[in-house]
Amino acid sequence: MNVSALLDQAKDAFYALTGSCCKTDATLKLNGRSFRILQLLGEGGFSYVYLAQDTASGRLFALKKIRCPSGMGDSVKAALKEVEAYKRFRHPNIIRCLDSLVTQSREDDGKIIYLFLPYYKNGTVQHVITANTVNGTRYPEQQMLSIFHGTCLAVRAMHQHPKSGPSAAAVRTGASPSNSQRRRNAGPPKMRSGSSYPPQNTLDGGSSSATETGNEQDPRERNSKKKKEVEIPLKQRVPAAAETDGLEPWAHRDIKPANIMLADDNSTPILMDFGSALPARIPIPDRRVALLQQDLAAEHCSMPFRAPELFDVKTGVTLTEAVDIWSLGCTLFAMAYGTSPFETAQQSEHGGSIAMAAMGGKYSFPPGEGEAQGGHYSERFRELIRRMLRVNPDERPTIQQVIDMTEEALQRLQ
């Protein structure tokens, strides 16, 4: 990376520190359209997310700017994979990429990739958790489980992703194969430098309203004849190929409260940030592949929400979508109690590391919350967390089983 590229990156870092008090009147011109940069929303690595406004329509966007310095070709590939992931998973609880653009950096030979995403004014679940901690409040169990349920529906769209052919919508609604065939996706066109390629909705239309991003059918509206108890087997083996025929499971690999936006209705969750997404089933034949996967997890998966099998990847195993189930368990715990179960103050006092605690499954509920009776949340709620936080990935429930348990818990709160 040359000096000019370093200076350019330093500018973004400066804006990150000073926030909205700088560059509020800056105007960015892309493909003949002008966008006013209002403030910095977040940053990470070589990427920055800004609140941008179309000067013509006044519409607000979350503009993600990804720097890909010269000599780092892998960073371009990784950024493009993130764009493809947004287009691959079409679901009401998964964020849409409204438009994307690849441009040549004016400072060096690198590339800059812009992603136009919907702007959600209510922020993320992490913002709510932080506010609860500051104000001494907490999520009501029913509201929390409802948000968690919508998040699980998004994860199911990844874990049960069809190989090719039927659209995600067809799979969700149970459309017949004949109807699905008629609605095949043609696949996204290639991104060209200096030009955009909108998916189904562009910057000119649509909105990020709750109507557009509502959950699938609310479990409270389902048939009252639904069975009352959900039995979860102790073992969840990796399904044989015949059992997943037609499916291509993907794993998000970085599920956490900060990656769950809240739509304008303040109750519809929107799963975001697919830069870490990978095909779920990854065989580990040797130590080289094990170390590669371990390094990828260290780079892309937040430690407090990382599954134990990703801290020390073993040879002769297959990594699966069960890593997301663990992250969901940590996320639900954090929604209820303020932090991941493996980064609590109690653990810090004992000097334990997050990695060792996760690999040993060492966590506890806050005082008064672990008993069968009492506490702010039900025993059924705590049992849901316990099931997801099994150290052995084969013992964790599938995403469908998690959804079933969550719906059962919601029904019992009626």
What are these regions (language model features)?
Residues 1-30, 38:
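Juxta-kinase regulatory segment immediately upstream of eukaryotic protein kinase catalytic domains
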Residues 38-45, 49:
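Protein kinase glycine-rich loop
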Residues 48-68:
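Glycine-rich ATP phosphate-binding loop
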Residues 65-89:
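Conserved N-lobe beta3->alphaC-helix segment of eukaryotic protein kinase catalytic domains
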Residues 96-113:
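Short beta-strand micro-motifs within the conserved protein kinase catalytic domain, predominantly
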Residues 108-124:
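Conserved short submotifs of the Hanks-type protein kinase catalytic core
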Residues 191-239, 246, 258-303:
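Activation segment/activation loop of eukaryotic-type protein kinase catalytic domains
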